[in-house]
Regions:
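Conserved cytosolic catalytic headpiece of P-type ATPases
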Residues: 1-5, 41, 287-294, 368, ...
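Actuator/coupling domain of P-type ATPases
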Residues: 60, 66-83, 123-126, 130-230, ...
Length: 737
């Protein structure tokens, strides 16, 4: 049997109206051969499906969904965002139009029912006005209910169709055959206004809900909007042609003019400019780009112009990967949602059972008016029950939370990671590249005689060296003129030498200077000892007679690291630093960063064991790293955080990626997680309370005590409000600090 190829894709869905619909489609997809896992997001109207391409295809999946009474977009990934946007716009416009006319027609029905019931032909006018509301504007409820019935299923639309259909037909019977009741001493009532207003309120509620759901995906739309449509390709003869980005190939030379968006990922070949990367990294300051530096799709060029060579195109660009990550994350389910999903799955059949039970109980205990009261109570129960609030409680909050993270340059892999982040009590971080810049830089330089010529000689010597520390000196002196060095030589383990204008110069260790009999001044010696005590590498520069300068080189702590550590500790989170460096170097870095706990001289394989040791002590551990040597520890941690400048392997393992490598994003992510989980709990609490209180009241539980029987119109308004309030509460997340 051939080995299959597994892919994970997100497909837009049409026809989802409630949590029951989402549960039904999810069940259909998971039942298909070749599907590993499928998850439906009601708030986004999407299905995230992992499947074996050898056993099934998007077209087969779409066919299965269509047979269930729904629809799924199965076109190529490139077309999906635009097509999804078009579908959402059309759905919103259709809902708004139907809601408007339903309200227009329902208002006179309510006015007649409340104030002019005794007017001639009042009942007939109400029947005529409410018929188009129920059976034309509300036809979608009946069509969907019938499709679900054919598949032995029931959803929110089943409840609406049953309640409004029963209310209308019962009223029509009472209007046409009033003597049936009058002969039994019962005054016949009509409930046309209830049927019309229920449809109007639900359509209005769904319109507001659709608008609010659109706001929850605003962050994703913003990311998709970063992708330019066209780019300028430069031919071998220098001619420039504008082409769609879909035609760009790896290796193409592209031109970028001031103010333009960069089309694909690549490396600058010619020219320089500043590029605004804030939409990807969350960093506000433009980044300088010169030959050799990387540029990314979706970022915006400022005032300069440059040419760059395409390295990653289409789905391989960083922006495309971020969009895919955010889509998959927003479509994922938090553990807290599992209970709500189970309840939503059995909700509709249970409500139909409660409605029938309330009808029977009214018939038994109130023989005189029981039929009327029973039908009214059953209709109200069907109307007020709302699985949508339960179904929307978690995904709307997750979508807003993950979208907000993406805007800040924090990529969260899925809802589970988002929920886990709020439980973290310990953060372990690698030193090199995570806490520090990850490359040696000159932190201090002390001169005995620091004229421009001496600087030029030091720079020219180090420029010829292959030692790793030489790059730091060369970078430090960037812009200094290069002098001609003769008789250059490398003294293994000690340093380098060379002659400039007949004078011999040396750069390297103190041992080299001592062997050459070079005099070291007292002040330089004291400075060298001080810098060495700070765990910095020392490079001496001298001529053949005396030491001219001492340079200190170290892997500098990031400006953001100290503040990040302080914020984490202030939040009650322990911070540990791991490094393979000596205890002296580790101790100095930890002290400067304000870290109380550190492990030095630790091997890559020991990092995972250290994380596991903390976990056995009961800690919830987040590991932040940037390299291949961190991948095992990242995989072991409860929450793995990759720093954006690191290796692809670290990012593949990580549940969270900080694009800018700014450690301050870690406390931000933890705070965002806590806010999101708090919002989910609030949503679920109110959704449960609404149904637990509303359904018994609708069934007539208060009638024996107070004579109060809930009007179906009020029930319809309450049901619509419950869904809208859940989405609105989730949207509050966007504006919290």
């Amino acid at each position: 049997m051939s080995k299959g190829k597994y892919v994970k894709r997100t497909f837009p869905l049409a026809g989802l109206h409630c949590a029951g619909c989402a549960a039904r489609v999810e069940k259909i997809l998971n039942a298909q051969t070749g599907v590993v896992a499928a998850s439906v997001n009601l708030a986004a109207s999407t299905a995230a499906v992992e499947y074996d391409t050898m056993q099934t295809s998007p077209e087969r999946l779409r066919q299965a969904v269509q047979e269930g009474g729904y629809d799924m977009l199965a076109d190529s990934d490139d077309d999906t965002p635009d097509e999804l946007e078009r579908m959402n716009r059309e759905r919103y416009r259709d809902l708004k139009r139907r809601a408007f006319w339903a309200v227009v027609l329902a208002i006179p029905v309510v006015v007649i029912g409340m104030f002019f019931m005794d007017m001639p032909y009042g009942g007939a006018i109400m029947a005529l006005l409410s018929a188009p509301v129920v059976f034309w504007l509300g036809r979608g409820f009946f069509v969907n209910a019938w499709q679900q019935l054919r598949h032995r299923s029931a959803t929110m639309d089943t409840l609406v169709a049953l309640s409004t259909g029963i209310a209308y037909l019962f009223s029509l019977f009472n209007l046409v055959f009033p003597e049936f009741w009058l002969s039994r001493g019962v005054d016949p009532h009509v409930y046309f206004e209830a049927a019309a207003v229920i449809i109007a309120f639900i359509l209005l509620g769904r319109t507001l809900e659709e608008k609010a759901k659109g706001d929850t995906t605003a962050s994703l739309k913003k990311l998709i909007g970063l992708q330019p449509k066209n780019a300028i390709v430069v031919a071998a003869d220098g001619t420039q042609t504008e082409i769609p980005i879909s035609r760009i190939r790896v290796g193409d030379l592209l031109a970028v003019r001031p103010g333009e968006k960069i089309a694909v990922d690549g490396a600058v070949c010619e020219g320089d400019s500043y590029v605004d990367e804030s939409m990807l990294s969350g960093e506000p300051l433009p980044v300088h780009k010169e030959p050799g530096t990387k540029v990314f799709a979706g970022t915006i060029n400022q005032k300069g112009s440059f040419h760059f060579r395409a390295e990653k195109v289409g789905a391989a660009t960083m922006l495309a990967q971020i969009i895919r990550m955010v889509q998959e994350a927003q479509g994922s389910k938090a553990p807290v949602q599992k209970l709500a999903d189970k309840i939503a799955g059995i909700f509709v059949p249970a409500i139909i059972g409660i409605a029938l039970l309330s009808f029977v109980l009214w018939l038994v205990f109130d023989p005189s008016g029981g039929l009327t009261h029973g039908i009214l109570a059953a209709v109200t129960v069907l109307v007020i029950a709302c699985p949508c609030a339960l179904g929307l409680a978690t995904p709307t909050a997750v979508m807003v939370g993950i979208g907000k993270g993406a805007e800040k340059g924090i990529l969260i892999r899925d809802a589970v990671s988002l929920e886990t982040a709020g439980k973290i009590d310990t953060v372990v971080m690698d030193k090199t590249g995570t806490l520090t810049e990850g490359k040696p830089v000159v932190t201090d330089i002390v001169w005995a005689n620091g004229d421009d010529r001496a600087k030029a000689v030091f720079f020219s010597l180090e420029k010829l060296s292959e030692h790793p520390l030489a790059d730091a000196v060369v970078h430090y002196f960037a812009g200094v003129p290069t002098l001609n060095v003769e008789r250059f030589g490398s003294l293994t383990g000690k340093g380098i030498e060379g002659t400039v204008d007949g004078v011999r110069y040396f750069a390297g260790s103190r041992r080299l200077l001592d062997e050459q009999g070079i005099v070291v001044g007292k002040e330089l010696n004291i400075e060298a000892q001080r810098l060495s005590a700070e765990a910095k590498s020392i490079v001496w520069f001298a001529d053949s007679e005396q030491a001219l300068a001492v340079a200190a080189i170290a892997d500098r702590i990031k400006d953001s690291s100290v503040e990040a550590v302080r914020e984490l500790q202030a939040a009650g989170i322990d911070v540990y630093m791991l490094t393979g460096d000596s205890r002296a170097v580790a101790g100095h870095i930890a002290e400067k960063a304000g870290i109380r706990h550190f492990e030095a001289e630790i091997l890559p394989q020991d990092k995972a064991a250290f994380v596991k040791r903390l976990q056995t002590l009961g800690h919830k551990v987040a590991m932040a790293g940037d390299g291949i040597n961190d991948s095992a520890a990242l995989a072991q941690a409860d929450l793995s955080i990759a720093m954006g400048g690191g290796s692809d392997i670290a990012m593949d393992v990580a549940q969270m990626t900080i694009i800018s490598s700014d450690l301050r994003k870690i406390p931000e992510a933890i705070q965002l997680s806590k806010q999101t989980v708090r919002t989910i709990r609030q949503n679920l609490f109110w959704a449960f309370i609404y149904n637990l209180v509303g359904i018994p009241v609708a069934a007539g539980a208060l009638y024996p005590v107070s004579g109060f029987l809930l009007n179906p119109m009020i029930a319809g308004a309450a049901m619509a409000l419950s869904s809208v309030s859940v989405v609105a509460n989730s949207l509050r997340l966007k504006y919290r600090r």
